[in-house]
Amino acid sequence: MGRTKAWQESGGPDTSAVRLKVTRSHMFTRSVASRLCAGNTAALPAEGTQPPVKVASTYNRGLPGEGRRMAGMTEPVTNWAGNITYSAKELHRPHSLDALRALVAQSARVRVLGSGHSFNEIADPGSEGVLVSLTALPPSVEVDTAARTVRVAGGVRYAELARRVHEHGLALHNMASLPHISVAGSVATGTHGSGNGNGSLASAVREVELVTADGSLLTITRGDARFDGAVTSLGALGVVTALTLDLEPDFEVAQQVYGQLPFAGLDFETVSAAAYSVSLFTDWQRSGFVQAWVKRRTDQPLHDFPWAAPATEAMHPVPGMPAENCTQQFGVPGPWHERLPHFRAEFTPSSGAELQSEYLLARPYALDALHALDAIRETIAPVLQICEVRTVAADSQWLSPAYGRDTVAFHFTWVEDTAAVLPVVRRVEEALAPFDPRPHWGKVFTTPPAALRERYPRIDAFTALAGELDPTGTFRNTFVREVLGV
């Protein structure tokens, strides 16, 4: 590539490359006639091939992304769910920032593997590219109590970040349902928790540090004209090595789970505003929610939740699943990071036997969207484990699904059956189409790229920024090129 740096002259970096044996029978081909529009997101396998399979030596049935081993290096690497097998022939785990910079500078295409909790090909660099894991870099977490900020390495998981922040008497504004996901990967895809006044996880970011295509180190801070394109960036601008996040004083949360909540007569705005964070669950086997997870800050006025009865036993979001992996319920106050997620940091939420989709639309459409989905619930229910409805405050990140509008998010946890799920995904997208839904970047969707781009007013600004920071296309894989048109 002709890209060199003085710091590369030490005889070559230790990038801890792992050779991967990738066979065609384990890969999605890109010539499938029924291939989906969005960058081959969870496309059906070509005739004569086998679906991707999980490899025991790659994921050890642990937390998302845990257990990915250096041993068994001839076996394919999959995402957490096992529905995507990465086509890269090498997985690199650099042990230092200099090694990472050297690796990027000498590579034609690079994508970063976070916690593996994406369900499409957003992280796949292609057979000629390299896959990079940040897990061997120092997992630094530096809390500045005076400034109320934390600087965190990109590969650190939210569970560890939250624990360290809490030790200093501070807090993040919100967390996602799972605390086991990486910080950099989460903000890059617009991942969020719930709460009418709570922005996505990316809304807490005040500074991004990334390695660009020529191996340079670049820092972009809030206030820079490029900042709103640099946080939720799909990994298309560089390798994010560190982020600085805003913090606030420590707080406690009390979580109460409630039972049946019918759609009939539902005042969605009032229900979603009843607590700091409200998550509503339905299995679409009936016209209503089966559970409401209500998370109240103890330092804010408490509001009643008169629309449903409190649960009398600990609940799991998926009916019938054991609740021991879930966070404390029954209104017992506890630290923010032990209540805002649905799942405990020390337990495994599931073993990956699922697919996921999510669609985010303007919050005033919440009831109309619920009724549109209710009309096709007999189609949804047979392949659904659970659907979660949450709210997210508007933000200014150019590629955020919550960009410019207070948002309601419909999340679907499907069964592990790609062939059965994809037709239902298309039906869901058709039902929600009148409301201009934006799919979660890291989940299964079939929205045509042209339609998707129309829903992001700053898409042209982002593509210009990608051209500026990555003129060689080092970080633009097939997914990014096709979905964003860059």
PLM regions with names:
Residues 54, 59-60, 66-486:
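Noncatalytic alpha-helical scaffold of FAD-dependent oxidoreductases
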Residues 2-10, 15-19, 24-25, 29-37, ...:
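Low-acidity, Ser/Thr- and Arg-rich intrinsically disordered low-complexity segments
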Residues 2, 11-12, 39, 48, ...:
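Residue-identity detector for glycine
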